[in-house]
Amino acid sequence: MNILTKIDDFVDQAGADKVGADHGPSEENGSSHPLFDNAPRSVSFNKLRKRLLRNVRQAFEDFGMLNGQKRWLVGLSGGKDSYGLLALLLDLKWRGLLPVELVACNLDQGQPNFPKHVLPEYLAKIGVAHRIEYRDTYSIVKEKVPSGGTYCSLCSRLRRGNLYRIAREEGCDALLLGHHREDILETFFMNFFHGGRLAGMPAKLLNDEGDLMVMRPLAYCAEEDMAKFAAAMEFPIIPCDLCGSQDGLQRNAMKDMLADIERRMPGRKDVMLRALAHVNPSHLLDPKLFDFSALAVTGASPEERREASPP
């Protein structure tokens, strides 16, 4: 049976007895991870959950995320997306569809008013192996970034370096991050408009040292779906005071632009994401990707040229 069909089957089974009630404990047959005991019992939530699981599993298959990795560190910021990622991974693992060990990790970066108790209590409650580590990168960011500058880039780099270190210390071979479809598209357009290059946010990346995979299983998941999922699951969301306190960020401008396009032409975000998976180097302008100098008039028909080309 195809793995995506298995996902449909087990979500249907988990949701079959839920219709007609708003919330409540799941059946004793263990069809769902205990994290979902108090999840909504509606048809709409069941469809949302299934869609997200299929998107995650499709990313696993498309990008070879299950090739050789045995132990994953799941970055948990306290935001809706990282909570959702952890829940979906636990859902798959509970049903035997994810043959890896999971370790959740939160890096407390010393942000003002950060509620230190929320994540440890939540992770202990749901019985997930985890590590909470304090590193005051906030002070470094405040010191290094000039007044009026944006914190996100430096904050992200400092956080990533610490997560790499923690992953190694925990014996993990991959770091999983909760970036979704909109994050990837926003990054693409930031690079397009401000960086002068075509580059997005890879779903799977080998770090510079070559010892850790960085993976984004939510690459196909819509931010709107993740927000609905987080609200339905009632995750204890922790806001990011650093990002939320700054206006005029380039990413916010890209987010607004994409939202406007989607509002005027529904479905364009999915089309944009598909475009990132269908690249034609000969129709761009980068001679490093396509040898334009080798093009020559041969008189051969298209069929003959195809036959002469190496497979």
From Swiss-Prot:
Gene Ontology MF term list: 4 iron, 4 sulfur cluster binding; ATP binding; magnesium ion binding; sulfurtransferase activity; tRNA binding
Motif (PP-loop motif): 77-82
Pathway per the UniProt entry: tRNA modification
Required cofactor names: Mg(2+); [4Fe-4S] cluster
Cofactor note: Binds 1 [4Fe-4S] cluster per subunit. The cluster is chelated by three Cys residues, the fourth Fe has a free coordination site that may bind a sulfur atom transferred from the persulfide of IscS.
Reaction(s) catalysed (UniProt annotation): cytidine(32) in tRNA + S-sulfanyl-L-cysteinyl-[cysteine desulfurase] + AH2 + ATP = 2-thiocytidine(32) in tRNA + L-cysteinyl-[cysteine desulfurase] + A + AMP + diphosphate + H(+)
Region (Disordered): 18-38
Pfam families tied to this protein: ATP_bind_3
UniProt main location, coarse: cytoplasm
EC id: 2.8.1.-
Locations listed in the record: Cytoplasm
Residues the entry annotates as binding [4Fe-4S] cluster: 152, 155, 243
Sorted UniProt keywords: 4Fe-4S, ATP-binding, Cytoplasm, Iron, Iron-sulfur, Magnesium, Metal-binding, Nucleotide-binding, RNA-binding, Transferase, tRNA processing, tRNA-binding
Domain of life: Bacteria
Leading EC class: transferase
GO process terms (BP): tRNA thio-modification
HAMAP family: TtcA
Assembly with partners or alone: Homodimer.
Further information: The thiolation reaction likely consists of two steps: a first activation step by ATP to form an adenylated intermediate of the target base of tRNA, and a second nucleophilic substitution step of the sulfur (S) atom supplied by the hydrosulfide attached to the Fe-S cluster.
Family: Belongs to the TtcA family.
UniProt function note: Catalyzes the ATP-dependent 2-thiolation of cytidine in position 32 of tRNA, to form 2-thiocytidine (s(2)C32). The sulfur atoms are provided by the cysteine/cysteine desulfurase (IscS) system.
Name by which UniProt lists this protein: tRNA-cytidine(32) 2-sulfurtransferase
